[in-house]
Structures are given as C-alpha cells and as structure tokens.
Amino acid sequence: MGGYGVIIRPFVNFAVGMFIFLSGYLTKENENGVYRDIIYRRIKKIIIPYIIWSFIFAIVNRRINTFIPDVFMSKCNGIYYFILIYIQMVLLIPVTFKLLRSRFSKLGWFVTPVSVFLIRYISLWFNIELGFPFQGELFVFWFGFYYLGASLKNGYINLQLSKKCLTNLCLFSLVIQGVEGFIWYWIGNFDMATTQLKMSSIITTGLCCIRAYIYIEAGDLNLNEQPVILKKFLKVLGDNSFGIYLSHMLIIRILNKLVPMVNIFPINAIFVIMISTVCVMMAHRILGKYAYVIGV
C-alpha cells in the first residue's frame, strides 16, 4: 500500500478511539458507586459472540491448536483487540469514576499520552521489540478517550469551543498526523507511519471525539430531520454495527478471493458494508431470539 496507506490512515485512525469515547459517553455515574450490574451486562453481551467468531477465524486460519491462547490475546482476528480493550474499560468503570471524583482527577488525562510516549516512542529509541499487550491491547493506550467520554457525559468538564474552531483544529491535526506519518515512512517504519498509537493520531482522535460530542449535544444529529433514506440507513447500520464488526473481515476475505478487482479503497469498503449488513440482518431473522449468541 506504501505512501497511499500513509495518506489514507489519518482519515480512519480515529475509529477505535471514537468507539471507546462513545462507550465512556454512554456510561452514567451511579450515586452509590456500585457498577456490578452494568459490568455484567456489557461483558455478557460481547463475550460469547467474541469466542464464537474467534473460533470461526481459528478454523479459517487453521490455528485450532493455538485457539485458547489466541482468544485471550485477540490473535484469532487482528481487529478483535478492540473487544479486549472494551472489556478492560468496562472493568475499570468504578476506578474511572473514583478518579474523576478525587483531587487527583487531572492524572487521568496523562495516562494515554504518557503511555504512548513511553511505550511506543521510547521502545523505538532503544530498539525494543514490542509484543502483546504493548501493540495496542493494553487499556492505558485508550483510557484517555474513555475518560473524556465519561467526563463530558457526567458534567466533570465543560467545553466552550466553537464548532468552527474545533473543525479547523481537527483539519490541522490531520495535516500534522500526515506529516508525522510520512516522516516515519521515509525513516522506513511503516507501522509507526500508519498506527493509531502515535502522538499526532492521539491528538486528532481526541479532537474528533470532542467534535462528535458537540455535534450530538447541539442537536445537529437529529435523525428525524434527516432525509428518509439516510435516516433508515443510519438506523440499520447502528442496529447491526456489532455484527458487522464481528463478520466483516470474513466478508473481506471472501470478496478478495471471488472478486479481487474490487479490492480498492473506498470501493471495497462500500461493498463490505453493504454485504456485511445484509448478511447480519439475514442471520438475525433466521436465528431469532438466539441471534445474540453470534452478536447479530
């Protein structure tokens, strides 16, 4: 993919951080400080589908013999590391709110940038090869986005930035991310050139999260005011998002085998979203009340 990949990545690097942010944003603080029920519900909802789909990919990848360690380290499917991160964030809900209420609340904002700098940049300086969980599976890389979402939702911070100013900051940070990406690319480190876990990417993602928050709170995202087709599309996409996430890598592999000529971004992305959505909806209809088992 080369330089093309370096150009494209800044426009998609915010995805995981944004989902983590939204998870924090959708978490309401309990006055009694007890979160057992929400922790149980959230983990129960994802753990069985994760194991089942991991097993499917273990079969496809012919790695049945290593399934047990692979499922614990999200190695059955590379993108499933998000589920491990999500589980860590859910387990940390009580800690998150205790930190927000404490006089040390500002420390929460340093967890992610300091971790990225110490683990990603310093390891490169000393030529230390990183393995699991320091390639992105550890909560410290993403905690800042969850902390931001929980802070905004529960009134711990109040932002006064205009939408125009924030949009300009997002665009400027995208340029900076592209510049840093090409610097790493010219050095010969394609991983750092495209990763979400570099300083410029963290800043861009944080700004995009804040922009999304202002967009939602300002009422700009009102589905009732959107064109009917767009409204239906967004609703279908939202209702089936988890199933699409779990299955779309399998759809990509099948498409690459059957019609390799469509493996060009953004054509492949459009095809994958459409086919994945249809497959998830069909599976939901066929399985009925048991659809939750595979996350559809």
Q: Language-model segments: which ranges?
A:
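Membrane-interface starts of transmembrane alpha-helices
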Residues: R101-S115, P133, S162-S173, A193-Q196, ...
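Hydrophobic alpha-helical segments with transmembrane-like composition
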Residues: K28, F57-I157, L255
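Aromatic-anchored segments of alpha-helical transmembrane domains
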Residues: S54-I59, T112-W125, C170-Y185, L250
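Alpha-helical transmembrane segments and terminal signal-anchor/GPI-anchor hydrophobic tails
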Residues: V140, I157-K235
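Transmembrane alpha-helical segments and their boundary/interface "anchor" motifs
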Residues: R9-M18, E29-G78, L84-M89, N168-L169, ...
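Interfacial loop-to-helix transition and helix-capping segments at the boundaries
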Residues: Y4-V16, D70-I85, L124-F145, G178-C208
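Transmembrane alpha-helical segments
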Residues: I20-T27, Q88, L92, T96-L99, ...
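C-terminal "closing" transmembrane helix and its immediate cytosolic amphipathic cap
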Residues: Y213-G238, M249-V296
